[in-house]
UniProtKB/Swiss-Prot annotation:
HAMAP family: EF_G_EF_2_B. This is Elongation factor G. PROSITE patterns: G_TR_1 (PS00301), G_TR_2 (PS51722). Catalyzes the GTP-dependent ribosomal translocation step during translation elongation. During this step, the ribosome changes from the pre-translocational (PRE) to the post-translocational (POST) state as the newly formed A-site-bound peptidyl-tRNA and P-site-bound deacylated tRNA move to the P and E sites, respectively. Catalyzes the coordinated movement of the two tRNA molecules, the mRNA and conformational changes in the ribosome. The gene is fusA. It comes from Bacillus cytotoxicus (strain DSM 22905 / CIP 110041 / 391-98 / NVH 391-98).
Length: 692
């Protein structure tokens, strides 16, 4: 099978936006105009082609990035729809990693919104070229030039209009093309009836002004064009287009276009812009990777001739075919039924079938080529971020880094049948989503699930119910406390039962003292002269270890303690391992009154990124959560606050931050160390755990 579309004619793009800017509707329209859908599904009726998980249709938000392929004017356009909600930023990062370009969708009434800032930052990190589509031009309060202004003010983006709208709100009925120097008028609501006309007289002055600004902005980035511009020479449409393309693909310039996806206006022109200005796989730098054994850096170019290499960027469980692994091919070709090496895990994998996905239908293909995005069936060990490559030419492509989960809750199956299914379901979900973890708590036996935020876990529990038919009760979020000693003491433990027949006898003297942080429990045997026989020493150590696991104050494990066995006595007949084990645990109980035990809590290193105007509120909020601010810095037009905050005070923080900053703040946190809990809180924890 030969390649259907050349690399030059391939585009891998993402559509990124704030919630409700109209991203899914825009994708829908693209699929409609490129002939992939026959009827258009509206998001607010819950029938959109891209939103194919049930919860997405109910909530009207996009959670999973579905990969779709479409065709436009002899080009293949692979589209990845990305979610716009803070809890799903990992989905966005994961898709940006494998894209060559993106369309940022703005709401014409609001311009750049909070999540736009987050996603824009992520796209800048990955060096993704972007064009901006100002959507909802038919909405009340729509203002194209205001929206362009927010790109400059909030993102410091070098963004300039390539189009101007004719009218706005109900009157929005056409678009002026500044590059082609013409206008398009829409006669009906399906947007299929388009008339190309000269720029209407009343708009000519404004169009000339903005065309001048556009040429000036592009000329600043292109020396040849600059010379022509300064000498007053005419710049042709072809030269202007080529210069815009060059500046856009090098991420120095962001073209802005407009329309209303809902009213089907401007979508075809947006597709034209994707083809004209966003890069093909040949226009982006070759991907770098390392050879597993030698750590030597190598490059893989977008070419069918190079050895096969691909990155798995998404795992999904499909009700019909099982596990689907979405991957982007960076170099070489792959045939279905062949073997590849998962170089990240060092495992050999067989690619069963290869599917080209269209939101929720699929087409089976026999070969994928460099630059393609497809889904494989049959990969067993591959997870998100893994590299797949040719068995003879191993390479590990730069993988994705995912943040640690920040919130955890206990989850209990409602029945025995649910319990059996829950383990499998949680394993599948954590395979799909690297920021979701599930484990069994050794201390309580409960199943704990952890994720990126409250909405994230809500949706996981929801998916358990719908997709895996598991009913479960969810507990309140929990903190893993610990205990330790602050003082040293020598204590005695004596266990004696000697009332006729064989008795029990064990007797020890143990010195306890605090150990260095992070060193855990250390045991030392200082017995001289055999006052405690050698065979009983391991029993003393085991007795202490068991007792320490169950805590001395509130039932949490005791950490960072040294214990030395210094003295004791035994009985020839009555002593046993069991007796010494019990004597050791009695010594630990005796230590409680002398060793000043305290409760420790996990401290989180928190980083909050916010617009400057919320600085005061956020600092106050951090302090009220027993946090210590450790530093501040400016990052672009945002402020970064770094602080150390107890985990127990961070529950509900994502929601609080969202309301304190109108959704414009983001935060991340990682575990840093354990620290002593203030006495008043320690007393509350002890009371709660003793059930008082």
């Amino acid at each position: 099978m030969t390649r259907e579309f050349s690399l030059e004619n391939t585009r891998n793009i993402g559509i990124m936006a704030h919630i409700d800017a109209g991203k899914t509707t825009a994708t829908e329209r693209i699929l409609y105009y490129t002939g992939r859908i026959h009827k258009i599904g509206e998001t607010h009726e819950g029938a959109s082609q891209m939103d194919w998980m049930e919860q997405e249709q109910e909530r009207g938000i996009t959670i999973t990035s579905a990969a779709t392929t479409a065709q436009w004017k002899g080009h293949r356009v692979n589209i990845i729809d990305t979610p716009g909600h803070v809890d799903f930023t990992v989905e966005v990062e994961r898709s940006l990693r494998v894209l060559d370009g993106a369309v940022a969708v703005l709401d014409a009434q609001s311009g750049v919104e909070p999540q736009t800032e987050t996603v824009w930052r992520q796209a800048t990190t990955y060096g993704v070229p972007r064009i901006v589509f100002v959507n909802k031009m038919d909405k009340i309060g729509a203002d194209f030039l205001y929206s362009v202004g927010t790109l400059h003010d909030r993102l410091q983006a070098n963004a300039h209009p390539l189009q101007l709208p004719i009218g706005a709100e109900d009157e929005f009925n056409g678009i002026i093309d500044l590059v082609e120097e013409c206008a398009y008028m829409y006669a009906n609501d399906l947007g299929t009836d388009i008339e190309r006309i000269e720029i209407p007289e009343e708009h000519q002055e404004l169009a000339a002004e903005y065309r001048g600004k556009l040429i000036e902005a592009v000329a600043e980035l292109d020396e040849e064009l600059m010379m022509k511009y300064l000498e007053g020479e005419e710049i042709s449409k072809e030269e202007l287009k080529a210069a815009i393309r060059k500046a856009t693909t090098s991420v120095e310039f962001f073209p802005v276009i407009c329309g209303s996806a809902f009213k089907n206006k401007g979508v075809q022109l947006m597709l034209d812009a994707v083809i004209d200005y966003l890069p093909s796989p040949l226009d982006v730098p070759a991907i770098k990777g390392i050879v597993p054994d030698t750590d030597e850096e190598v490059e893989r170019h977008s070419s069918d001739e190079e050895p096969f290499s691909a990155l798995a960027f998404k795992i999904m469980t499909d009700p019909y075919v099982g596990k689907l692994t979405f991957f982007r091919v960076y170099s070489g070709t792959l045939n279905s039924g062949s073997y590849v090496k998962n170089s990240t895990k060092g495992k050999r994998e067989r690619v069963g079938r290869i599917l080209q996905m269209h939101a929720n239908s699929r087409e089976e293909i026999s070969t994928v080529y460099a630059g393609d995005i497809a889904a494989a069936v049959g990969l067993k060990d591959t997870t998100t971020g893994d590299t797949l490559c040719d068995e003879k030419n191993l390479v590990i492509l730069e993988s994705m880094e995912f943040p640690e989960p920040v919130i955890s809750v206990a989850i209990e199956p409602k029945s025995k049948a649910d319990q059996d299914k829950m383990g499998t379901a949680l394993a599948k979900l954590s395979e799909e989503d690297p920021t979701f973890r599930a484990h069994t708590d050794q201390e309580t036996g409960q199943t704990i699930i952890a994720g990126m935020g409250e909405l994230h876990l809500d949706i996981i529990v929801d998916r358990l119910r719908r997709e895996f038919k598991v009913e479960a009760n969810v507990g309140a979020p929990q903190v893993a406390y610990r205990e330790t000693f602050r003082a040293a003491a020598k204590v005695e433990g004596k266990f004696a039962r000697q009332s006729g027949g064989r008795g029990q006898f064990g007797h020890v003297w143990i010195e306890f003292e605090p150990n260095e942080e992070g060193k855990g429990f250390e045991f030392e045997n200082k017995i001289v002269g055999g006052v405690v026989p050698r065979e009983y020493i391991p029993a003393v150590q085991a007795g202490l270890e068991d007792a320490l696991q169950n805590g001395v104050l509130a039932g949490y494990p005791v950490i960072d303690v040294k214990a030395a066995l210094v003295d004791g006595s035994y009985h020839d007949v009555d002593s046993s391992e069991m007796a010494f084990k019990i004597a050791a645990s009695m010594a630990l109980k005796a230590a409680v009154s002398k060793c000043n035990p305290v409760i420790l809590e996990p401290m989180m290193k928190v980083e909050v990124v916010i617009p400057e105007e919320y600085m005061g509120d956020i600092m106050g909020d951090v302090t009220s959560r027993r946090g210590r601010v450790e530093g501040m810095e400016a990052r672009g037009n945002a402020q970064v606050v770094r602080a150390m905050v107890p985990l127990s005070e961070m529950f509900g923080y994502a929601t609080a931050l969202r309301s304190n900053t109108q959704g414009r703040g983001t935060f991340s946190m990682v575990f840093d160390h354990y620290e002593e809990v203030p006495r008043s809180i320690s007393e509350e924890i002890i009371k709660k755990n003793k059930g008082e």
